[in-house]
């Protein structure tokens, strides 16, 4: 009989008993697709809630523009890192159409997966902005964190800034999470590195273009608040930045690997029916 125990009771260490191994139970394609969709929806919901909330919090407290930029960047970077640790095991934790596009162009995800990831992100951003709207009194909503261009800054400059900041974020994603296929040790530092890239981008762009780096980060709050000023900048800039990052990574930075057979090594056949316990 297969014994099923809750996840919290997993304490098995395969290194102490080499006669056993942990086997990940396969799931059907529809279940896998639903879990990926839901993880992107839930992660984007939280991300938009935290990002919009960070902007509202930054303007609700007294301080100069530099302090607000650092506070907003720190909250958003830490929130993204926490969410990657939380849900990256299911969908990879894109939470950003620009990151999804970069992963698609680099060959990490397929076209169909990319489409329903983006659909989940759009639904999640609306839900997250709606929850944020309900949490805050009117005097603190501040357009739910919809970014605005600084005085004297034109749309071309804002486009270039969003493109550059998003490209480094996508390069960081591709350089850490994509390479995890071959080096699982990067799983431990990838969320921190990606969160740090977002922190840097938001801190730089906060007082100029707004430092969105994510189209749905602006879309959800814009739908709920009705503020659409220069909205196209926050789609076109990150998308071009993602394309640029994917091109640089795939053509210049990506390492090439070949999978070869080990001489004299026969991979063991795994029969799930022989499991002594299930988790």
From Swiss-Prot:
Residues 62-69, 136-158, 210-227 are extracellular. InterPro entries: Aquaporin-like (IPR023271), Aquaporin_transptr (IPR034294), MIP (IPR000425), MIP_CS (IPR022357). GO terms for cellular component: plasma membrane. GO terms for biological process: hypotonic response; water transport. It is found in: Cell membrane. It comes from the Eukaryota. GO terms for molecular function: water channel activity. SUPFAM superfamilies: Aquaporin-like. It is a multi-pass membrane protein. A motif (NPA 2) lies at residues 214-216. Aquaporins contain two tandem repeats each containing three membrane-spanning domains and a pore-forming loop with the signature motif Asn-Pro-Ala (NPA). Here, the second motif is Asn-Pro-Val (NPV). May form a water-specific channel. Required for prolonged spore survival on fruiting bodies. Belongs to the MIP/aquaporin (TC 1.A.8) family. This is Aquaporin A. It comes from Dictyostelium discoideum. The lineage of its organism: Eukaryota, Amoebozoa, Evosea, Eumycetozoa, Dictyostelia. The gene is aqpA.
